[in-house]
Amino acid sequence: MLQINDLTFDAWGRRFFDHASVSIPVGAKVGLVGRNGVGKSTLFKLVLDQLHAGDGEISYPKSARIASVDQEHPATPVTLLDTVLEADVERDRLLASLDTAPPEDLGEIYARLEEIGADRAPSRAAEILSGLGFRHADLSRPMSEFSGGWRMRVALAAALFAEPDLLLLDEPTNYLDLEGALWLEARLKKYPHTAIIISHDREILNNSVDHTLHLADGKLTLYVGNYDSFERQRDEKARLQDATKAKVEAQRAHLQAFVDRFRAKASKATQAQSRLKMLAKLPPV
C-alpha cells in the first residue's frame, strides 16, 4: 500500500530520516512508535505531501484515497450528521448529479449509489458518531454549537466514515473519554483498509494493530505484531546483536594478540600476515 524507498529528510537543523525504507502491506493496521520528537508526525506530513523529502521516494497507488485528522472540523451551520455524510465525496457528488444528469445516465448513477451503500450511509454515520460519544439528539445540531474538542471527534468520525485507503491518525485518543477510546480500538481493529496510528496509548497499540513500525536513528523498521510483540522482538534482536558483537570482539582480540606476538618473527611472518587479513575482514561492531 505504502512504499518508502531510501528516504532522507533534513529540517530545522537536524536529520529526521537517513536513507529509510519500508513497505506497508495493504490492509495492515500499523502502530508508528519511537521516542518523542523523533519524527513520527513529520513522516505523516511527508506522506501527505505537506513536507517535501530531500531524497528518496514515497509512493502509493495513484487511485488511493488518503485521509488524516489534523485539526477540528470548522464551526459551520451544517448539521452534525450532514457534516459526516459529506466526507464521502463520491456519494455526495453522485446524489448532487441526480438533478442535472441526462436520463440515460441515471441508471448508471443509481447502480453506483447502490454499490457504495449510499442508502445505508446515514445509519452508518450515526453509528460512528454514537461510538464517539454523540447522542442521537446531536445529529441535527449545527456544527457551530459544538466545542473544539467535540469538533475534533467529528473530524475523526468523518475520516472513519469515508474509509480512505490509507488512514493516518496522530494521537486519536487524546480527545476521547475511556468509552470512546475503547470503541475506537475495536473499530480500528476491523478497519477495512490500511491505517497507521501514532499513539502513546499502549492499549490501542496492543488491541488495534497487527504491525508495529519503529522509527529510530533515522531508520524505519517494520515488525509483525502489536506493541508487546514488538518489544519482545526488539529485545531479542538487541540480545543477538550483543552476542554477535562480543563474539567478533573476542575473535578480533585473539587475532590481534597473535599478530602482535609473532609479527616480528620471520618464521611466523606468513601466519601473522594471514591473521592481519582475517582482521581486516571482520565486520565492524
Where do the protein language model's features map onto the residues?
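Intracellular alpha-helical coupling/juxtamembrane segments of multi-pass membrane proteins
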Residues: 233-258, 262-285
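ABC ATP-binding cassette signature C-motif
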Residues: 1-246
